[in-house]
Amino acid sequence: MPSFALLLREFALWPLCLVPEPILLLLGVYKKRKGPSSKIPLVLLHGFLATNSGYLLLKWRLEQQGFQIHLPRLGWFAQEKIEVLAERLAQDLERNNIKKCILLGHSTGGVVGYLYAQQHPSSVTKLIALGVPFSGSPLAKIAFFSVTARQLIPGNPFLRRFKGPKPFKARAYSVMSAQDEVVPLSSARLRGAKTVRLDGLGHLELLFSHRTVQALGRILGDHNS
């Protein structure tokens, strides 16, 4: 169970994940890729009712380590089916001429990434799931008004696809925490994926903690080779 102090930290981080896209555009967050690169880009996929602002610190930290980052603009994940979001991701990557990539998805973003990897297996070299509800989240019931959230209510037929062997060859990693107040450990586990435990961190803290950066560094260590 998450502590009261952890919940306070999560509440304080929440606004950092909600900066509107127009402001991110003004800040120059979405810079166009300059020509071809020998590096495989790391594509960051945000979660439900969030924007790419939650990834800005992690993006900066990873760029300092030499990784090439791409932030697709997929919307708020509220009134669209996750299958539609995966197709939108495919269109974004095609538009940006990204033929191969590493996908890192937080929460619902990881579900979107899984579907993309399933549909485009030759395009994904690694899939990294950061607090992803592969078996759903009990809190999804609170957001019953959302088409996206309803797909993530435990027991929804949509979630059956995550029960069997992963339908792609890319290596998969599931990063999770026992103190994640949104995604229980049992839901974050993915068959065929290597489990990485970062206990003590909340759902949003997974985006901001230096421990996450260290874990990602180990996972991504050879992605440019």
For each feature predicted by the language model, list its residue ranges:
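A hydrolase-biased, glycine/serine/histidine/acidic-enriched motif that marks catalytic-domain neighborhoods
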Residues: 155, 160-161, 175, 198, ...
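Short beta-strand/loop motif that positions the catalytic acidic residue
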Residues: 174-176, 180
